[in-house]
């Protein structure tokens, strides 16, 4: 995923990506903080969601894409400094749905954990993006 405009926007970096697994990171900057100077939950959510997609992406066949169906996230600790590190693993990959887990850390401290389901499909010819 060398061309990922959203990842570029938030400053997300790929550390490792292979079929069923990914690691990514984000250096905490002022733009990631809420008014209380804590990393906004949406930043952590975006890191987990992107990590899940990165873990699933290499398992896709030509012409297939994936899209988030749902994600459940638990936030364990407030984050004021970083960097944030996310490890994501595909737990189950079926023909049309995959279940993926992300764990987000600051150092060795687990600050959030997410579980998501992703649709796997071939897009229709109109109105949907294809696999890059």
What are these regions (language model features)?
Residues 1-132:
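Terminal targeting signals and extreme-terminal segments of soluble enzymes
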């Amino acid at each position: 995923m060398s061309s990922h405009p959203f990842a570029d926007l938030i400053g997300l970096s790929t550390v490792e990506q292979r079929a069923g697994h990914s690691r990514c990171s984000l250096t905490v900057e002022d733009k990631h903080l809420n008014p209380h100077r804590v990393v906004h939950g949406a930043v952590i959510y975006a890191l987990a969601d992107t990590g899940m997609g990165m873990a699933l992406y290499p398992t896709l066949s030509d012409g297939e894409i994936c899209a988030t169906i749902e994600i459940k996230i638990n936030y364990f600790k407030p984050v004021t400094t970083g960097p944030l590190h996310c490890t994501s693993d595909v737990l189950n990959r079926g023909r049309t749905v995959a279940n993926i887990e992300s764990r987000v850390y600051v150092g060795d401290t687990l600050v959030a954990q997410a579980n998501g389901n992703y649709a796997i499909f071939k897009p229709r010819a109109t109105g949907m993006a294809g696999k890059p």
